[in-house]
Amino acid sequence: MKRLFTLPFLATSLFAQEPNKDIKEGHSHNGHAFNEGPRQEGPLMRSTGNVHLAITSSWDKGQAYFNQGLGQLHGFWYYEAERSFRAILAHDPNCAMAYWGLSQANYENEKRAKEFIAKAGELLKKEDFKISDHERAYLNAEVAYHDDKKEKDATKRRKNFIRAYEDIVLNNPEDLEAKALLVCRRWQFNRKGIPITSHVGMDAILEQIFAKNQNHPAHHYAIHLWDYRNHKQALDSAARLGQTAPGIAHMWHMPGHIYSKSKRYQDAVWQQQASARVDHKHMMKWFLLPDQIHNYAHNNEWLSRNFSHLGMVRASIDMAKSLLGNPRHPKLNNPGRGSARYGRRALIDYLEKAELWQEALETVNSPWLEVLSKPEDDLSRLRLIGVAQANLGQQVELRKAIEGIEPHLTKFKVDQEEAKKTAKEKAEKEKKKEKEVKAAEKKAHDQFQKNIKKFENVVVELKGYLAAMNGDFKTAKEALSKRPSQQSPVLRHLAYGDHEKAAELSKAQIDKKDKQTIVLAKAIHALYHAKKDDAAWKVGFEDLRKFGSEVDLESPVFARLAPIAKELGYPADWRIAHKLAGDLLPRPNLDELGPLHWTPPPAPEFSLPDQHQKKVSLSEYRGKPVILVFYLGAGCLHCTEQMTAMADRYSDFEKSGLSILAISTDDITNLKDSQDNYSKGDIPFPIVSDAAKNIFKQYTAHDDFEDQPLHGTFVLNAKGQILWSDISADPFMDIDFLIKESRRLVSLHK
């Protein structure tokens, strides 16, 4: 719908505003909320879903971009939804529904959502502001939802929001988007204290949508709705969802939930691969860090897990390493969160599960599994060392592993006693009652107890293995009862001579029919050797053949089944080819969707002049890693702070084998000012001019919506690939992190 009035400034886009000198270079002129999110305009993708909600916009492409953003909202692709809605505002700053879209895209970021919808609220207050009643209903609902001054009770605001959307549906029964968003928020609010009273009722609303548009992306909400209630009800949606919005990775991911719960691991893996590939292709195009993408790390960890369930040992470990090889960022991804956390946990888990003991020992002393500063975070790596040494029969090395863990346990206990003493003395000094003194002591005690218990369990487990190596199976069994082996209790019972227990656990595992190949293979092996006359191991092997079509036959877990397979008369390759289920729709070729693993994208080449008009080319740095710093000229004070910090630490960069090249928005004549700003002589790295900002734009260090450059820091490897980046309203100032992460990534992506 075209806006029915014209204002003198209507044709003025956001990026044409007069600069405000009080705003820092790189910061948005439209408010703090605009400093985050995408700041580069993208094309119409035409792969984000067949959706439509009529809006009022003076821009001829406004409706198309709004529909794209709406489809991205349905796919929880919030980052890209912002890009679509910002594109509208860059051409039509009075499009209230674009602000609605930005607010919706920040459902999980209340502060930014309120800032965006407040902009729409200002427009609504204008007497001559003309939009449809339909749009006004959407906007009023969003404004009221975020108005915590008028209604402080968040639960009431959520209930009012649901009622407002019900009214939109009642007044506009053909509005499929209102119905879809109603179901979406109803499911989301279920997690916020407003339980769904009727899943069937919500599903009936979805069926109304699908009756009009069979391939509406609301299949996404059908999967969420039924995921934990009755997953089989969402099998049709699982088959369709990816094709409804093929450009959105999350829409390929979600069917994996349903197929995993249905134990259809081949189908789950296909979906999760599709999701990973679409994500990787997109992030490489836009120089995005993997963890900027919603649910990216969750998808790829689950993919690694399902690879393991299928017995695809190498694929499982490679995906775990892929997560660890992703670039890290202080705001997104570190050993305690995101890709790094998922990858570390998965790699340690699957090396042990697949019994790759030698590879495990090689990996724990490599950049893949670096030593973490906190002992409690590093415990899983330390434990893996001990488990691997035990399984390799290395008694001396196992003792060393135990001796490497015990001092941490001792320190936790000492610190616990010291904390209790301090807490007691403090409480007594404050003349607290005896009950309060004991409570203070207990609080101090409890903050250490979790870590103490974790370390005690590992020490008990490893000492049990050591006892078994010395023939003391009584102690080994006691340890096993206190601390069951995380991965292979059946094999431990078998090794300790407790065949009855090994047979009992193995048979129970075979009877579960959970289709997890590695666990089943161990159960078959254990039952065969513990109680061969029990035919359950034969049944288990026949099951394994049917759903183990992808297992790595040379992996230790499956290789030891070869004699059993021969005894049963199976061929050397005993796997039976997998047959696709009949409820699947046609699928695209996976390779066409993108690469399976994140691959550093090639850095755009350039050749720019320095202050002496000498051309400096990126190609000159080929063969060695380099850090590119995009800074906004000598007049930018916080840019100068970054340049000074990097110049002061230049020797540390050199020791790490890292060169630095700075690209400035200054013209050649003003480049010298940057040198003059540095009080300690000449800046020890080259500075080149990109006054036209062409290279800034190629590296996406540019706000296309407001036509201004952004701060950017990039790490390139010797092959000229972008390993890491930070593009922001502010320069990246954590120099220690930059050096450490650059070293790590360069070592992993040579």
Residue ranges and their predicted role:
Residues 549-605, 619-622:
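N-proximal helix/coil linker or "cap" segments that precede and/or mark the start of modular domains
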Residues 640-681, 693-698:
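Structural microenvironment flanking redox-active thiols in thiol-disulfide oxidoreductases
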Residues 18-219, 231, 243-245, 263-274, ...:
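N-terminal alpha-helical interaction modules that lie
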Residues 709-750:
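Thiol-/selenol-based redox modules, centered on thioredoxin-like
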Residues 8-16:
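Hydrophobic h-region of N-terminal signal peptides that target proteins for export
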Residues 618-646:
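Short active-site neighborhood of thiol/selenol oxidoreductases, capturing the structured segment around
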Residues 66, 97-101, 180-181, 220-221, ...:
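Alpha-solenoid helical repeat scaffolds
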